[in-house]
Amino acid sequence: MSDATTTRVCPLAERATATQVIEDLAPSPWVVRRCLETGFVFLENPPGYDSLKEELAWQVTYQRESQQRARAEPLRYALSRCLKYLRRSVARRHKVADLTLALAARAAAGRPHDQAVHLVDVGCGSGELLGGLMQRMPAALRQRCKPHGVELSTELARQSVLALAPHGGHCRHATALDGMARFAPASLDVIVLSSFLEHETAPLPLLRHCDAALRPGGFVLVKVPNHASWNRWLRGARWCGYRWPDHVNYFTSTTLRAMAEKAGLEVERMNGRDRFPLSDSLYAVLRKPLRPVAANGA
């Protein structure tokens, strides 16, 4: 693996603060710190972007992590896989897809019928989310929606282009910051950050880019590992939300709200089900204010 890493201060404070090293959590050489001022937990020395394109690309680390968990706890791993299958295939529950569809419909209802609704999935992988969502949409909504993706992995970006092209969309092979910066100001309606913000070494600048690219009233849907979950307290270093070195930020509802508001976004939804302590996932719907507000600390 490449030796290139970066060194970060607290991503929420964006400056040097007093921190505490969390011992016996990440394997060497990775260092995890908690900011004593904000409570934010982060990887101090994440790998650089170049290694994330290939050797530490999501599909590589996900497969490796899955294999390690299957070997370490085969029964628990098998049960987890079974429950995921039941939720998605039998109960047909996919919270991110369902929320994205609802937000797209809201965005369309608030705009003239002859105007397109632009959706962006940041860290879109193979394009499965928006590609599948376009097929689920009612015809009238599908005709108005334009799906876009941003993906750093070379191979996944190629797959995403193929998935989105039939729906008039495209994937930008770029970092999240560069990809979002290419969108015109106030041009997007819905941005999806599903299982992504925990990977981004500059999460607050990314949210600021999202704010700039959104039309007033536009939405950001966030899903991240829930660092306040009871399972994390129970499992400790074996918690499923810990993945080294590609998970670099660990959010609670408090720190996610603080970061969103610092970026100039409002938290429209983060209800009890979205931050349920028995769930390993934390959800939030952020919204760009209809009237400009001064971003806190921007």
How does the language model describe each region?
Residues 142, 201, 215:
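Short conserved AdoMet
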Residues 11-18, 253-270:
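A SAM-dependent methyltransferase catalytic signature shared across enzymes that methylate proteins
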